[in-house]
């Protein structure tokens, strides 16, 4: 009795301990189940993120992406991932935790739906990219076709331009030939007038009377004919070439006496360049003289003969009316490079009864030289100054380009422009010879001079 009681007393704590152990084991089971469920969810989220990242990241590898499916054979597997090497990764959940399972099924469905939507978006994006590439390819093909057509058009334009250039060259040559024929015809008329005048003088002396008015009219015809070298004994030099042929062959200032201006005037003679005998009518060398002058100054001349000067349009006209003259233009830039332009036919107001009223038109052709032809296009043009607009432009070219010249619309040369000393920012308003230095370089030195045509020309 006593021992049974002791046993009962001793066994009571053992029963209480057993109940407590069962309670503790049940609590641990729930905790373990919760931990496993959390790990499974975290693992599923991680795997899903990795899969999404792999879908967005286009790796250079050609391996197919892993396939994610539900495992119908094993209901305890939440997700099965099949890799490229045919191995599988199963994500399990504890079957003893039935309560969260519906939520996991919903999560699984949402993830699979998101993956399906992502695949669909990729297909749509791929279709758009293909459409864009197709459109770009069509545009490139159209551009290539357009470039080919433009190139063909350019080749046609080039052929037409070359043909026009040849025609223009032929027309220039024909113009020079006609000018020479007209000059020779005028010379013959002048010689005929001189002969008739001599006959009239003889008749007047014999008859004691005459017709002075007719004689005066005939003498008005310009006497522009060929002449012998030098001047006859006792006669006055008509230009620097006569002086040169008389034996005076030093550069300097001399007096000349043109046929139609017997009182004469002084000129500077270049006796050294290309055989000598040149009569200088323009020089630019240091910018000491203002060449932006008016009509009267350019008609009568200005400056200093030994330095910068303009001889005068009227005097140039009187000189070039005597015979067939050639023009030489010497040029120098600020790097001391030199060039020249030679025109075998030159004159001012050759066919004018009143050259000033006609604007002192220039006649020029037959270019040779090293500077390029920047004056031939001005042939036939009248002289324009800032106060006398004779050009073809809507504006006064002399005022616009700060010079005075035989402007057309407006110029390819401007030797009476501003002395700007080399390269300048303004356009074409310096001492320009465009075929040699362009329109934005003002030359250091220019000299324009004339001489009778040589026999070999």
UniProtKB/Swiss-Prot annotation:
Glycans are attached at residues 233, 336. NCBIfam families: GGGWT_bact (NF040941). Residues 231-454 form the Fibrinogen C-terminal domain. The record marks 401, 411, 427-428 as: Implicated in ligand binding. This is Fibrinogen C domain-containing protein 1. Homotetramer; disulfide-linked. Residues 1-20, 211-235 are annotated as: Disordered. GO terms for cellular component: membrane.
């Amino acid at each position: 009795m006593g021992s049974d009681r002791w046993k009962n007393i001793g066994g009571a704590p053992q029963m209480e301990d057993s109940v407590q152990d069962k309670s503790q084991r049940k609590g641990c089971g729930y905790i373990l189940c919760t931990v496993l469920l959390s790990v499974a969810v975290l693992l599923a989220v991680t795997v899903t993120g990795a899969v999404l990242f792999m879908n967005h990241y286009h790796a250079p590898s050609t391996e197919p992406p892993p396939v994610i499916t539900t495992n119908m054979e094993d209901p305890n597997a939440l997700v099965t991932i099949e890799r490229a090497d045919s191995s599988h990764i199963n994500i399990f959940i504890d079957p003893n935790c039935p309560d969260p399972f519906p939520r996991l099924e919903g999560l699984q469905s949402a993830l699979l739906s998101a993956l399906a939507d992502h695949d669909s978006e990729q297909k749509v994006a791929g279709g758009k990219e293909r459409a864009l590439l197709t459109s770009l390819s069509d545009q490139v093909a159209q551009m290539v076709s357009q470039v080919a057509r433009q190139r063909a058009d350019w080749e046609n334009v080039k052929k037409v331009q070359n043909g026009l250039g040849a025609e223009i060259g032929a027309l220039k040559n024909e113009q020079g030939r006609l000018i020479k024929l007209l000059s020779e015809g005028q010379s013959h008329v002048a010689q005929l007038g001189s002969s008739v005048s001599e006959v009239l003088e003889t008749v007047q002396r014999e008859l004691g009377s005459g017709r002075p008015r007719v004689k005066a009219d005939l003498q008005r015809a310009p006497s522009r004919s060929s002449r012998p070298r030098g001047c006859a004994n006792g006669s006055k030099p008509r230009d620097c070439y006569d002086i040169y042929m008389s034996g005076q062959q030093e550069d300097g200032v001399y007096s000349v006496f043109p046929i139609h201006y017997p009182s004469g005037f002084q000129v500077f003679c270049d006796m050294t360049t290309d055989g000598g005998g040149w009569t200088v009518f323009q020089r630019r060398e240091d910018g000491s003289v203002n060449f932006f002058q008016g009509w009267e100054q350019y008609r009568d001349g200005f400056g200093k003969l030994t330095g910068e000067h303009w001889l005068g349009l009227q005097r140039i006209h009187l000189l070039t009316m005597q015979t067939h003259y050639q023009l030489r233009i010497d040029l120098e830039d600020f790097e001391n490079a030199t060039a020249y332009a030679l025109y075998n036919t030159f004159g001012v107001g050759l066919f004018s009864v009143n050259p000033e009223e006609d604007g002192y038109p220039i006649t020029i052709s037959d270019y040779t030289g090293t500077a390029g032809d920047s004056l031939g296009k001005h042939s036939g043009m009248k002289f324009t100054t800032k106060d006398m607009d004779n050009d073809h432009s809507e504006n006064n070219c002399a005022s616009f380009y700060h010079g005075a010249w035989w402007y057309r619309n407006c110029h390819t040369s401007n030797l009476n422009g501003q002395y700007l000393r080399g390269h300048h920012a303004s356009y074409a308003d310096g001492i320009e010879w465009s075929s040699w230095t362009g329109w934005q370089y003002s030359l250091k030195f220019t000299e324009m001079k004339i001489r009778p045509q040589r026999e070999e020309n």
